[in-house]
Amino acid sequence: MKLVIHPAVDQARLTEITKAAGTMTIVNATDEPSAVLALSDANAFFGKLTPSMLAVAQNLEWVQCPTASLEHFVFPELIEHPCVLTNMRGLYSDVIADHVFAYILCFARNLHLYLRQQMRSVYEPIGGEAARTAFATGPDHISAIDRAHLDIADCTLGVVGLGSIGREIARRACAFDMRVIAVDPVQMEQAPNVSVLLSLEELPRLLNESDFVVIAAPHTPDTER
């Protein structure tokens, strides 16, 4: 068995791959001509495959895409090829969910505005310095500063697509005590961490009720509208 990798991975990753591969021959191709030469008798490939590389791969049985999305990876010859094509589905769910909540917290607490103000040495709260609550006003006073910021525990998060990424985002939302509503074309039964599960036809309801909306659907002709 022979595995070709292109673009080449760093030495640390190559060492781990070699350990896992056992007796398999590993070729870490630094350029496309080297990859083309090695693919002539290769059984497996990891990385970014091109039509010219596939054309010489007579024994190719398995192609591993290094990303979860495939829209920038596949091409007609690969679609027609009998090899098995796999992706990194589920591998990036936690990273993407963390990134989503970085944005949610940023906009909820106006961090994007505070950073701009900081660059100008302005430290006034969003809502105005005059809106600061004095002790005399009492704890029930709602100021312009309060209204300019969101408590995400009072917010609704809409999730479009309940794949591995969408479910991980919903799990984090529940940890922040957010209400989660979702739409998915496949998930018909109530999903964990989702308060309301809607059909695709009910997408307008999700958009109407959500303070934040996350599109976690794959990029396909059906979702590009």
How does the language model describe each region?
Residues G166-R167:
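N-terminal Rossmann-fold NAD(P) dinucleotide-binding loop
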Residues I5, L157-V159:
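Hydrophobic Val/Ile/Leu positions in short beta-strands of Rossmann-like dinucleotide-binding domains
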Residues L162-G163:
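Glycine-rich Rossmann-fold phosphate-binding loop(s) that bind the pyrophosphate
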Residues M1-R89:
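An N-terminal-biased, well-structured beta-alpha scaffold segment characteristic
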Residues C83, R89-T156:
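Phosphate-binding beta-alpha-beta segment of Rossmann-like dinucleotide-binding domains, i.e.
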Residues I181, P185-R225:
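Rossmann-like adenosine-cofactor binding region
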Residues T156, M178-R179:
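Residues at the starts of beta-strands that form the adenosine-phosphate
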Residues A173:
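Aromatic pocket-lining residues of Rossmann-like dinucleotide-binding sites
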